[in-house]
C-alpha cells in the first residue's frame, strides 16, 4: 500500500488539461515520488518522478516562466 497526498491541482487555461500533483510514499522502503497526472478528455498521462527529476523539471519551468513577458 502507498500513501497519496494531493499537493496541487489546476486546469491549463489554453487547452483545458487538468493537472494534478501528488506526493506518493511507497509502503515498502518509504520511497517518495512526485506523481504528475495530466487529463485530456478521457486520456490520462501519468509520470512518477524522483526528487532530482522534479528539481530539474521545476527549475527549467520556473526559468522559462521568468523569461516570458507579463
Features from the language model and the residues they span:
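Positively charged, low-complexity terminal tracts
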Residues: 1-70
Amino acid at each position: 500500500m502507498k500513501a497519496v497526498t494531493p499537493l496541487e491541482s489546476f486546469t491549463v487555461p489554453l487547452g483545458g488539461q487538468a493537472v494534478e500533483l501528488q506526493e506518493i510514499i511507497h509502503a515498502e522502503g518509504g520511497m517518495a515520488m512526485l506523481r504528475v497526472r495530466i487529463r485530456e478528455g478521457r486520456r490520462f498521462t501519468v509520470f512518477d518522478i524522483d526528487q532530482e527529476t522534479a528539481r530539474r523539471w521545476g527549475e527549467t519551468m520556473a526559468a522559462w516562466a521568468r523569461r516570458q513577458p507579463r
